[in-house]
């Protein structure tokens, strides 16, 4: 059965694993999910990620990050642009998540970027998700 929104599925798996204090989470692999994982690692929300071969296709494995007393590094994740309601932002009107404490993941013509990176490059795009 095909998935309607694979990005929402990825974010939900990540949110659930984070809430249950799992060390890692496994999901089906795609290029856009790998790029989102790369942004999450650069911003310090996860410790790492890798692609593993599965019986059918490939799996993406995200290693979750916790503080010294098992504090979660991800407080929240929200999918913004959905298949039924796309949300776009101009370069002059890019969103700030929690006043700059969180990260907006934006799909631009330069690839997936954070809100800050898109602002520096002067490009807008589709707002995929907020992570804080």
From Swiss-Prot:
Arranged from A to Z, the UniProt key words for this protein are: Ribonucleoprotein, Ribosomal protein, RNA-binding, rRNA-binding
Q: Which Pfam families match?
A: Ribosomal_S8 (PF00410)
Cellular component, GO, one term: ribonucleoprotein complex
**SUPFAM superfamilies referenced in this protein's UniProt entry, alphabetically:** Ribosomal protein S8
Set out the biological process GO terms recorded for this chain's protein: translation
Which GO molecular function, any one, fits this protein according to its record? rRNA binding
* Keyword Ribonucleoprotein found: yes
| InterPro entries named in the record | Ribosomal_uS8, Ribosomal_uS8_sf
Record note on quaternary structure: Part of the 30S ribosomal subunit. Contacts proteins S5 and S12.
Family membership: Belongs to the universal ribosomal protein uS8 family.
Role this protein plays: One of the primary rRNA binding proteins, it binds directly to 16S rRNA central domain where it helps coordinate assembly of the platform of the 30S subunit.
Q: By its UniProt entry, which PANTHER family does this protein fall under?
A: 40S RIBOSOMAL PROTEIN S15A (PTHR11758)
Name of the protein in its database record: Small ribosomal subunit protein uS8
Taxonomic classification, please?
Bacteria, Bacillati, Actinomycetota, Actinomycetes, Kitasatosporales
């Amino acid at each position: 059965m095909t998935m309607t929104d694979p990005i929402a599925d990825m974010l939900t798996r990540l949110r659930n694993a984070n809430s249950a204090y799992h060390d890692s989470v496994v999901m089906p692999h795609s290029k856009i999910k790998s790029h989102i994982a790369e942004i999450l690692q650069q911003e310090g929300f996860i410790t790492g990620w890798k692609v593993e071969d599965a019986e059918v296709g490939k799996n993406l494995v995200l290693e979750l990050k916790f503080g010294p007393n098992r504090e979660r590094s991800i407080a929240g994740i929200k999918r913004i642009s959905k298949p039924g309601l796309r949300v776009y932002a101009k370069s002059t009107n890019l969103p700030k998540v929690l006043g700059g404490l969180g990260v907006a993941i934006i799909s631009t013509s330069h690839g997936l970027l954070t809100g800050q990176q898109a602002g520096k490059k002067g490009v807008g795009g589709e707002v995929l998700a907020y992570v804080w």
